[in-house]
């Protein structure tokens, strides 16, 4: 039973019952630069390291098509980690679908656009807008297909149909789309602050228009669950050899002192 104080099946826009005006994404160079600095430093200042596995899987995509990059959504940091991945590692233009964007309007100048789940008509407006943006193969749409925040490693993983709607309409309109799954987790290892773990799954290049939406959604759920389960086992068993350290924070002064003290020779005891 989920704790309703922490998690709810009701989307925030419905829960707060506040009308949200649809906001399109823009790509203002100044605000993109500002957002880069903010997002980069926020992650680097709050995590000991970011480790990434199978980074080169991203290069296996069909570069003639745009990209839908999808991940689990368990906490506030997921969007910031996604921003760092798209901008610093994948080097693409990011677009993010954000509920309650009216509370953070400045993000729209760096690639975010709003979705209002108060009604199906309002939600559809955002989905159609996403399809229009994905004409550009240099764009990556970062999305959380579960559609709502869930507890860490929550099972079963169930997708809402928004992502498959976007993907199938991109296939009809542009001939194809890359679906790139990202397993995302956070864990304390041997330091005082947590580390971020990212595994890039094999891209699914969707070009078939005949697959039913329900069948495609279930296929993507199974594939994504396998990826996330594998990552969870790797972390729990300490099997981290294949993870590349993308960044690692400098040790705080008291940790550096601790390491120096450990190197001091102990006096011999007769």
Q: What are these regions, as identified by a protein language model?
A:
Residues 23-47, 102-111, 248-270:
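Alpha-helical membrane-targeting segments
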Residues 53-55, 97-99, 115-117, 182, ...:
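Conserved beta-strand termini and adjacent loop/short-helix elements that scaffold enzyme active sites
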Residues 48, 120-124, 160:
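A conditional alpha-helix N-cap/helix-loop micro-motif detector
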Residues 2-18, 127-270:
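Non-catalytic C-terminal accessory region of glycerolipid acyltransferases
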Residues 61-121:
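Catalytic core of membrane glycerolipid acyltransferases/transacylases, capturing the structured
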Residues 11-13, 32, 39-44, 78, ...:
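Catalytic cores of transferase enzymes with a strong primary signal for eukaryotic protein kinases
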Residues 33-73:
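Helix-to-loop junction immediately C-terminal to a conserved catalytic motif
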Residues 57-59, 101-103, 119, 186-188, ...:
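Residue-level detector of flexible, active-site-proximal loop/helix-junction positions
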């Amino acid at each position: 039973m989920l704790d309703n104080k922490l998690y709810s099946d009701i989307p925030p826009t419905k829960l707060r019952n506040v009308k949200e005006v649809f906001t399109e994404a823009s790509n203002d160079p100044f605000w993109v630069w500002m957002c880069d600095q903010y997002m980069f430093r926020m992650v680097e200042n709050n995590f000991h390291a970011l480790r990434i596995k199978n980074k080169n899987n991203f290069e296996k995509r069909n570069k003639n098509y745009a990209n839908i990059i999808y991940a689990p959504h368990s906490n506030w940091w997921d969007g910031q980690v996604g921003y760092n991945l798209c901008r610093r590692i994948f080097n693409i233009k990011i677009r993010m679908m954000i509920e309650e964007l009216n509370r953070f309007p400045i993000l729209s100048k760096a690639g975010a656009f709003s979705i209002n789940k108060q009604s199906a008509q309002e939600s559809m407006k955002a989905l159609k807008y996403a399809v229009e943006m994905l004409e550009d193969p240099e764009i990556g749409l970062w999305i959380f297909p579960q559609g709502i925040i869930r507890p860490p490693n929550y099972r079963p993983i169930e997708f809402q149909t928004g992502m498959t709607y976007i993907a199938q309409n991109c296939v009809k309109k542009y001939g194809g789309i890359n679906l790139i799954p990202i397993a995302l987790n956070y864990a304390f290892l041997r330091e005082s602050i947590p580390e971020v773990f990212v595994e890039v799954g094999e891209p699914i290049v969707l070009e078939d228009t005949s697959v039913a939406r329900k069948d495609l959604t279930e296929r993507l759920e199974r594939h994504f669950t396998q990826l996330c389960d594998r990552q969870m086992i790797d972390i729990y068993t300490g099997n981290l050899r294949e993870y590349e350290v993308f960044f690692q924070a400098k040790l705080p002064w008291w940790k550096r002192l601790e390491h120096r003290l450990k190197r001091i020779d102990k006096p011999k005891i007769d």
